[in-house]
A protein has these predicted regions:
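A flexible loop/linker signature enriched in serine peptidases of the S9 family
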Residues: 99-106, 128-133, 152-161, 176-179, ...
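Generic long, charged, amphipathic alpha-helical segments
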Residues: 308-339, 421
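Non-catalytic accessory segments flanking enzyme active sites
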Residues: 44-140, 151, 230-283, 325, ...
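N-terminal pre-domain segments of enzymes
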Residues: 1-61, 69-83
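Hydrophobic beta-strand positions that form the internal "hydrophobic ladder"
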Residues: 94, 145-148, 193, 243, ...
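Beta-propeller blade signature
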Residues: 109-112, 163-168, 206-214, 257-261, ...
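A conserved hydrophobic secondary-structure block that centers on an alpha-helix together
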Residues: 117-184
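Blade-edge beta-strand/turn elements of extracellular beta-propeller
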Residues: 124, 167-179, 214-226, 263-271, ...
Length: 436
């Protein structure tokens, strides 16, 4: 079998004072975004070439087919196919996910707190049935627990379509919302959803508010990012009082906010964007909290009262050679992370006493710890913390912040077998070329 060849058609091009010939410029299609949505619009000659390349590759790799299968089975053997996530409380329900050995996608389940009746409110395998491609963007349950908003891409184009379904009877209640980035944010009163729409260059540039039960053509544009290198997104505050819009590029960000009771949202700017300055905002306990690298190479945390926006005070000041992470809020506790000498650490602060200390969950020398961000119940002393290390698969604990007692509630299983005691992990320090 001969190596597939794509015909050459020299086309002169110039840029920045240089001129050259591009033999394959003819492949470029002006309607490439339409091609992403509908593969039948791909140039027939290019499609034929790609199919020939695939056939050639398969033939050339034929001698390795048994090895490929062996490697695949070895990798697959390290994954527990039938698994169940830990339930987390969200208002009147507990939610969790589940996978099966025969399925390719997860199921989402819930049950009312105090009840044993389990509802499957999302089954990825059922949704994907009959589709050549299937990818879930977001799954979001309304605050009143009655509706599921979800987004899917069934073409591989990364254009997501949003659907809204009544959970009780699994019925889609309105027409789909097309050409979105996939993210979904419910309004706190369950009357609207917010979503980001992709522009003709596949960039998330516009944020719309959609009223449940109406047509997408009537959706309200509440924000548009017009600078080419910036994209936008929307989220909510921890205290469920504000919506936050983020406009950002790789090293610069800008935030806007509006309140839950604004009939027509009027996003208000926090701090004007400045090249190289990143910041994020949250709201809790009558304060706005900002995580920023403004005059803080490795970040700091400041806060201001809702009633005194802009009058920032240090909460966690910048530290030399210490990377400061964000905050997780509970009624009586504030948790956060730091990275010191390339090692991550967790810290917990008692809101009543203002005392802060390190939260230690393992005596291993090198670990990567984390805090569950699914925690919706804020009136608690118990949090889920986890860690993994070069020799320990992920372990998740329920940790009592008051008593410092911890309980192992889940450990990542390796079905093909693994013994962590077969390994030793040591951390060695040595000077670099700069003497540090």
């Amino acid at each position: 079998m001969n190596i597939p060849k794509l015909r050459k058609q020299p086309i002169k091009k110039d840029c920045h004072g240089y001129t050259w010939e591009d033999d394959y410029a003819w492949i470029h299609q002006e309607n490439i975004l339409e091609v992403l949505k509908d593969g039948t619009k791909l140039l027939p000659e290019v499609k034929t070439y790609l199919e020939a390349e695939n056939s050639y590759t398969k033939k050339q790799m034929r001698d390795t087919e048994n090895l490929q299968k062996k490697l695949f089975q070895e990798i697959k053997g390290r994954i527990k196919l039938a698994d169940e996530g830990l339930p987390y409380k969200d208002k009147a329900y507990e939610y969790w996910s589940k996978t099966t050995e025969e399925g390719n996608y997860s199921k989402r389940l819930r049950k009312k707190i105090g009840s044993n009746k389990v509802e499957v409110y999302w089954d990825g395998d059922v949704e994907a049935k009959g589709k050549k491609f299937f990818s879930t963007g977001d799954l979001s349950v309304s605050y009143n627990d009655e509706y599921l908003a979800y987004s899917i891409d069934d073409k591989g184009s990364e254009y997501f379509t949003i659907y809204i379904r009544r959970i009780s009877d699994n019925k889609i209640i309105e027409e789909p919302i097309v050409d979105t980035a996939g993210g979904i944010v419910w309004s706190f009163d369950d009357q609207f959803i917010f979503y980001t729409k992709l522009d003709k260059l596949h960039r998330p540039k516009q944020i719309f508010r959609h009223k449940i039960g109406t047509s997408q053509k009537d959706d309200l544009l509440i924000f548009e990012e017009k600078e080419d290198s910036f994209t936008c997104s929307i989220g909510t505050s921890t205290d469920e009082k504000f919506y936050f819009i983020t406009s950002s590029e790789h090293t610069t960000s800008e935030k806007y906010y509006f309140t839950h009771d604004e009939k027509i949202p009027q996003p208000k700017l926090f701090i004007k964007r400045k090249a190289g300055i990143e910041y994020s905002i949250d709201s809790w306990d009558s304060y706005f909290w900002m995580h920023t690298n403004d005059n803080a190479k490795d970040f700091k945390i400041v806060r201001c009262k809702h009633s005194a926006i802009g009058q920032w005070e240090d909460f966690i000041p910048a530290k030399d050679e210490v990377l400061i992470g964000g905050l997780v809020f509970l009624k009586d506790w504030i948790l956060r992370s730091e990275k010191i000498n390339a090692l991550s650490k967790l810290f917990v602060r008692n809101v009543k006493t203002d005392h802060e200390e390190e939260l230690i969950i393992s005596d291993e020398e090198v670990i990567s710890p984390g805090i569950s961000l699914k925690q919706k119940d804020k009136n608690t002393d118990i949090v889920r913390v986890s860690y993994e290390s070069p020799k320990t698969p992920t372990r998740t604990y329920e940790y009592n912040l008051k008593t410092k007692e911890k309980k192992l509630v889940k450990e990542l299983e390796i079905p093909s077998g693994y013994n962590r005691d077969d390994y030793i992990v040591r951390r060695l320090n040595c000077d670099g070329h700069d003497g540090r």
